[in-house]
Amino acid sequence: MSAAPVSGSVFADLEPLLPRVSKPVQYVGGELNAQIKDWDAATVRWALMYPDAYEVGLPNQGLMILYEILNERADALAERCYAVWPDLEALMREHGVPAFTVDSHRPLGAFDLMGVSFSTELGYTNLLTALDLAGIPLHAADRDT
């Protein structure tokens, strides 16, 4: 497996895993109204997470409004992230693929900020799983910034 650059796409490492999971389409992105902005042109890069399955989080209006507002700004970039199902989580751990956004498949750790929209407390453990998959320390004191 090739190691992706810190801010580069992990799709080359993710794609071979997709035939081995249920509903792989939820991880490929490219939906109507999805936005992929120039990474280098953005001053601030947001990863917006809905910590539940793609089909639950995609229609969330709050997350989509924030996604649109941030991407309307010339200085900002926002991409979406959802919880992965256990089948892909196991493969990601086995193959060293970090948690990623569905828009450009960049690792969550490459973003400046991470926003999370919870609809229930059940999403808390999914956030912890995503942080762990991303290699982001759970405790703020253990992070660089």
Predicted regions, residues:
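A short, structured N-terminal alpha-helical element that caps or precedes a catalytic domain
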Residues: 1-145
